[in-house]
Amino acid sequence: MTNPLYHKHIISINDLNRDDLESVLHVADKLKQHPNSQLLKDKVIASCFFEASTRTRLSFETAIHRLGASVVGFADGSNTSLGKKGETLADTISVLRTYADAIVIRHPQEGAARLASEFAGDIPVINAGDGANQHPSQTLLDLFTIKETQGRLDNLNIAMVGDLKYGRTVHSLAQALAKFTGNHLYFIAPKVLAMPEHILHLLEEHGVEYSQHETVDEVMSELDILYMTRVQKERLDPSEYANVKAQFILTSADLVNVKDNLKILHPLPRIDEITTDVDNTPYAYYFQQAGNGIYARQALLALVLNKNLVL
């Protein structure tokens, strides 16, 4: 039976239905047990990062190597023909499709990954983050981590805290959780950084329960997952950043009356929104979460490049 993700562009988490998500998580679990497979031997993956990245780029490249493939690309778009000579993204992708079997792209402009897919032909494009829009591979590792720690993706109380306006990770995660049942999402942010209306409307269309708050204290005791985010200085004007950067800081003292199964996640990098004393609590799981990025991205690459994947 042909794998439905074969040669599929992964631009938005909404490109994947629940069955697709569960397939990726199943393969990720198998690869976590046996990470050094050769599922992509002799394949070449283009890693094109037009925007700064540490974890996403390095975990993708680690995933590529562990699958037996080779990686070509760049970590600084300003040193490419697009950055130096004014080449269009369309032309860049039209050339890269002749070099590689798949293209992983991060770009500061919303919609850039979708545009790239339109010029890639049958070469799958994986969005590694486009502006404040989507970050589907981060969402897959988030879902994998939630399932790993909670044993399920349904009937959970999940809080997302901090920058919900510009944070592409929470946009994608909220949309993904809408594909599962019985979850309650708590959105905790200052009004200036609230979850965008189009995300709220999507949740309403799917019958997802959610509530909005300005402090985490009122819901902390109910939570299974606390998903912290940093206030993104690079996407705010200085006065706006100064007003909100210290509004949501989690310390170990905040974790007194929490559920035993609570896990704290964060897409990283952390600045000062989680103090280091939280790291040594049994609830901190953000470094393990980052490590899971390798397996989720291995699974995604293996599925889009293997017509009949059996594990």
Curated annotation (Swiss-Prot):
It comes from the Bacteria. Catalyzes the condensation of carbamoyl phosphate and aspartate to form carbamoyl aspartate and inorganic phosphate, the committed step in the de novo pyrimidine nucleotide biosynthesis pathway. GO terms for molecular function: amino acid binding; aspartate carbamoyltransferase activity. Its EC number is 2.1.3.2. InterPro entries: Asp/Orn_carbamoyltranf_P-bd, Asp/Orn_carbamoylTrfase, Asp/Orn_carbamoylTrfase_sf, Asp_carbamoyltransf, Asp_carbamoyltransf_Asp/Orn-bd. GO terms for cellular component: cytosol. Keywords: Pyrimidine biosynthesis, Transferase. This is Aspartate carbamoyltransferase catalytic subunit. HAMAP family: Asp_carb_tr. Carbamoyl phosphate binds at R55, T56, R106, H135, Q138, L268, P269. Belongs to the aspartate/ornithine carbamoyltransferase superfamily. ATCase family. It catalyses: carbamoyl phosphate + L-aspartate = N-carbamoyl-L-aspartate + phosphate + H(+). Pfam families: OTCace (PF00185), OTCace_N (PF02729).
